[in-house]
Amino acid sequence: MTKSELIERLAGQQSHVPAKVVEDAVKEMLEHMAGTLAEGERIEIRGFGSFSLHYRAPRVGRNPKTGDKVELEGKYVPHFKPGKELRDRANIYG
């Protein structure tokens, strides 16, 4: 599901709320979450999961076109850990 599909689906479920208001709310929520992570803070949504930053250590990578070795710096990357409730709902084959 893309962001625009999410907005469309939410707007359809909330017919009393204009689609533009739903779009603005979704965009603002995602922007706020990204800003919170950029400040190094963790986000926890009970029953859904948590977002945090994980550190990736420096390493030697390869340029896919040339095969040359490339030194990659350490960096922080976003990480999502699903909550138990979400894991249980997503486990449709278990």
Swiss-Prot record:
Source organism, top-level taxon: Bacteria
Alphabetically ordered keywords of this record: DNA recombination, DNA-binding, Transcription, Transcription regulation, Translation regulation
Membrane-crossing residue ranges in chain numbering: none
GO BP annotations, alphabetical order: DNA recombination; regulation of DNA-templated transcription; regulation of translation
Quaternary assembly: Heterodimer of an alpha and a beta chain.
Protein name in the entry: Integration host factor subunit beta
Protein family: Belongs to the bacterial histone-like protein family.
Record carries keyword DNA-binding: yes
Annotated GO MF terms: DNA binding; structural constituent of chromatin
Annotated GO CC locations: chromosome; cytosol
Task performed by this protein: This protein is one of the two subunits of integration host factor, a specific DNA-binding protein that functions in genetic recombination as well as in transcriptional and translational control.
